[in-house]
Amino acid sequence: MLKIRVNNLKRIIALTISVLILLGGCMHLIQSETQPPHIEGMFWQPDLKTTPPTGNWDLLGVSTFVPQWSVVQTKSWFDHDIGFTKWEKNINLKQLNQNPWAENIILGLAGEYDEKLARSKVVQLAANSQQIIDKTQTIPLKGYYFPVEADPTWLGVGILGQALSTLPKPLWVSIYSAEAMPAHFDVWLKSWLPEQTHVFFQDGVGVGTRSPQQARIILDGLQQEFGQEKVIIVLEAFRATKSGKFRSAYPWEIIEQLKAYEGQKVYIFDGPHYMNRMTVYVVAWWYKLKYGSSAKAKTSH
């Protein structure tokens, strides 16, 4: 990730806040008449640097937390006895659940860092995932996430559908495409997705594949076929750099994505790495000016 000098970062934040202040005086005249985006969830890709995860994402309305993996490289990120050795740093799911942004947990199951390796081990990862599920029955969970991602280039994706069919529900899986506007994306998905499995669609904005507006068109097409509750968009809160690495998206970049996803339930990838407290404050402030109340109020039940 690119390192930004503190002074430059302060200027960026000051500029963003100044623009919001200028807009705030007349925002009540141009508040969106459409439904605001419902920022429900936050992903976390566990690593040693961000364990345990901390943040203020509840200010955006986040109440569901998605640790991408419970187990990766056959080592567990949680301190529960689930039959795997543990990473040097790990967390307790019940303690995680006490955070306001993790009132609900969709538990990521067994995966691998390397996508090709994960795809080649789908059957074994499903078996490991069932073991995790069996060992976490006493923990209240919103559902499970099987962390083997699919795209149309995976010719053997049918085996993923078979693996998903063996796991308890509610269950989620994620999909993406390296094409800006993939043709027959819904047909491809329907060819292997089990009926009771839900889908996270990665918007592809962070990796530079498409614009937020293009992502919305794809999302609408998928939801027309599968239903709005079955397909949820994942907002990539990062941007690719010329060096091939990734940086955190600037607040105004995230805002552009959120505007494109009005009326939709949104999950963000990922909080601990890319959504720091200042970014959250700025986006939450914009949300309040744009829609007339805070994201937290809009999404509370």
Task: Name each model feature, range by range.
Residues M1:
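Switch/coupling segment of Walker-type NTPase motor domains
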Residues N8, V19, W57-L59:
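Compositionally biased regions
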Residues I4-I13:
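Bacterial N-terminal signal peptides that target proteins for export
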Residues M27-H301:
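Glycan-processing catalytic domains of CAZymes
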Residues I13-L20:
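Sec-dependent N-terminal signal peptides
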Residues I21-G25:
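Hydrophobic core
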